[in-house]
């Protein structure tokens, strides 16, 4: 078989195989720069795009009402309840881990992913990537009304 014809047959097959594997990149984080925050900066009510809220209290507890969370590859997951939260940071960004007192019925025994802190202008954000990274699920983004 001539080389040109063999190449013409191989290229479409390779293209199909690559597209079947999904995206080459994951969804980018929301707009904003990573920021390190003090625990006192986090103690407020954070709101997601659908009106869900996460109220972080100074004593390390929280109250959530239908707030978006990222758990494994589940998408569009909202969680209500109470629990505890912890603050952590690396060299450039703070993170908030939440632990609910009761399991979500869809994800028994799994913990939500940590939220990362961002700042866009004067707006503070907490965010987590949602769902399968090969799909275009929107990120879970919480904003602070105090910002």
Q: What is each model feature region?
A:
Residues 49-100:
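N-terminal glycine/threonine-rich, aromatic-flanked beta-hairpin/loop signature
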Residues 24-33, 52, 63, 92-147:
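Beta-sheet ligand-binding and adhesion/scaffold domains
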Residues 17-20:
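C-terminal motif of bacterial Sec signal peptides marking the signal peptidase cleavage site
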Residues 35-37, 41-48, 73-79, 103-110:
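Short, solvent-exposed secondary-structure boundary motifs
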Residues 1-9:
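Bacterial N-terminal signal peptides that target proteins for export
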Residues 28-53, 85-87:
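Tryptophan-anchored aromatic micro-motifs
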């Amino acid at each position: 078989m001539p080389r040109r014809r063999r190449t013409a047959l191989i290229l479409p097959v390779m293209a199909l195989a690559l597209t079947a594997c999904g995206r080459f990149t994951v969804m980018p984080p929301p707009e904003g720069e990573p920021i390190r925050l003090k625990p006192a900066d986090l103690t407020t009510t954070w709101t997601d795009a659908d009106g869900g809220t996460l109220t972080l209290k100074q004593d390390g507890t929280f109250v959530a009402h239908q707030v978006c969370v990222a758990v494994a590859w589940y998408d569009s997951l909202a969680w209500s309840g109470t629990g505890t939260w912890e603050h952590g940071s690396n060299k450039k960004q703070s993170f908030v881990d939440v632990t609910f007192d009761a399991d979500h019925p869809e994800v028994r025994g799994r913990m939500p992913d940590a939220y990362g802190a961002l700042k866009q202008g004067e707006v503070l954000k907490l965010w987590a990537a949602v769902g399968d990274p090969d799909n275009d699920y929107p990120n879970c983004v919480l904003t602070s009304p105090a910002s």
